[in-house]
Amino acid sequence: MIPGEILPGEDPVEINPGRPVRTVLVRNTGDRPVQVGSHYHFAAANPALDFDRDLAWGHRLAVPAGTAVRFEPGVEREVDLVPLTGARIVPGLRPESAGPLDGRAVRAGGAVRAGGAVRAGGAVVGDSPAATPGTTGATGDLPGYLGEGS
């Protein structure tokens, strides 16, 4: 064994076991690629991404920790989201989602989340009907994730 060496097991690793999953259709309406990290509050992602932000409220990408999903300009793709857990308080990030994720209304930086919609400047942000609820986690190939054997 080499000091610091990681010896992963043979079996696949289940990601987010037992967590409910939502599938959301996302389109990058901007002219530049957008990358969203694994634990970022997805409803607060770059405004150039068009998707149902209400459905994404309180959720993050269902991908391994430390990874990200890249959205190319003009391209649509489906992503799976899982609920943020723990205290469910978002520290900072974007003003429209900073603070507690649960409650009757959340206000920050001129944006309001009330009645199930994320509103900024009086307009609902995002409105995609293509979202479906689902159930739990995917499995991943840990050696592949660690960059071994690729």
From Swiss-Prot:
This is Urease subunit beta. Residues 122-150 are annotated as: Disordered. Its EC number is 3.5.1.5. GO terms for molecular function: urease activity. It is found in: Cytoplasm. Keywords: Cytoplasm, Hydrolase. Belongs to the urease beta subunit family. Pathway: Nitrogen metabolism; urea degradation; CO(2) and NH(3) from urea (urease route): step 1/1. Signal peptide: none annotated. GO terms for biological process: urea catabolic process. Residues 122-140 have a biased composition (Low complexity). Coiled coil: none annotated. Its main location: cytoplasm. Pfam families: Urease_beta. It comes from the Bacteria. It is an enzyme of class 3 (hydrolase). InterPro entries: Urease_beta-like (IPR002019), Urease_betasu_sf (IPR036461), Urease_subunit (IPR050069). PANTHER family: UREASE (PTHR33569:SF1). One of its GO terms (cellular component) is urease complex. Heterotrimer of UreA (gamma), UreB (beta) and UreC (alpha) subunits. Three heterotrimers associate to form the active enzyme. The lineage of its organism: Bacteria, Bacillati, Actinomycetota, Actinomycetes, Frankiales. It catalyses: urea + 2 H2O + H(+) = hydrogencarbonate + 2 NH4(+). Gene3D superfamilies: Urease, beta subunit. NCBIfam families: PRK13203.1, urease_beta.
